[in-house]
């Protein structure tokens, strides 16, 4: 299981997150997703702790806490397949308004 950490500063590093979560136990892994096109951090992370008890303690201790000027959103990460059935998944971005780059005149 892993923990979802949202509303992060775009300046945060894996080391910053590891240090905060280390207060609640051993941090096995920190993943900071970046935007595919810009390479910029997306403002959330996933943290994997050494045990379920450590993850629960971290969630209870950090959810809603202010860190780096932001109120953290910390909860159990949902498995990818359950993340929502809003259709399309990662296929979006090409249809609709995507064809306006070339002028015919």
From Swiss-Prot:
Residues 2-79 form the RRM domain. This is Putative RNA-binding protein RbpF. Residues 75-84 have a biased composition (Basic and acidic residues). Residues 85-105 have a biased composition (Gly residues). The gene is rbpF. It comes from Nostoc sp. (strain PCC 7120 / SAG 25.82 / UTEX 2576). Disulfide bonds: none annotated. The keyword RNA-binding applies. One of its GO terms (molecular function) is RNA binding.
